[in-house]
Amino acid sequence: MAYTLPELGYAYDALEPHFDAMTMEIHHSKHHQAYVNNANAALENLPELAQGCPGQLLTKLAEVPADKLTAIRNNVGGHLNHSLFWKSLKKGTTLQGALKDAIVRDFGSVEAFQAEFEKAAATRFGSGWAWLVLQENGKLAVVSTANQDSPVMGKAIAGCEGYPLLGLDVWEHAYYLKFQNRRPDYIKEFWHVVNWDFVAERFEKKVEHCNCTK
């Protein structure tokens, strides 16, 4: 089953003035499309691995042939991460309810959570992602991953683990047209476009046995 580029569900300029339309268009139609194309190419002769969603595949990278591992890790990871990212973006939503209560419980305050998340995003050397994850013990945590690694890959591969609720892409292609080298400014703008309704849904439903974006 070939992967396909998901539709955004909103216009490229829907997140203006925080995220610009040109970056969104290039990021989605060029960068994400490349991950989809390369993932499909890597899986072309591995139909047993191509079944199901990318999140399921990334939890069992140990089953991937060694000569395909890097390509699948990078490109299926990129497809999964971006698919989650697009759904995590929307103006005008509010952090509330059970998710807000859990954030206050585990970080002390919403402000403390945001500060920790911003630090993870700003200090990720080179390319990667910052994440809010739900751990197996039921607590929330902030982690970061390099390149297109995802927490669903597990600690041995990604250096962390957890069920991703919210991710921020800190590759330069995600922000450089608008923010140039000012990554901290990009991170600050992110809070204006987080789709807290989507994040809360992931927190409350925790899609069983799947780390995709259904």
Curated annotation (Swiss-Prot):
It comes from the Bacteria. Disulfide bonds: none annotated. InterPro entries: Mn/Fe_SOD, Mn/Fe_SOD_BS, Mn/Fe_SOD_C, Mn/Fe_SOD_N, Mn/Fe_SOD_N_sf, SOD_C_sf. Its cofactor is Mn(2+). Its EC number is 1.15.1.1. Keywords: Manganese, Metal-binding, Oxidoreductase. One of its GO terms (molecular function) is metal ion binding. GO terms for cellular component: cytoplasm. It is an enzyme of class 1 (oxidoreductase). It catalyses: 2 superoxide + 2 H(+) = H2O2 + O2. Binds 1 Mn(2+) ion per subunit. Mn(2+) binds at residues 27, 82, 169, 173. Destroys superoxide anion radicals which are normally produced within the cells and which are toxic to biological systems. Belongs to the iron/manganese superoxide dismutase family. Homodimer. This is Superoxide dismutase [Mn]. It comes from Pasteurella multocida (strain Pm70). The gene is sodA.
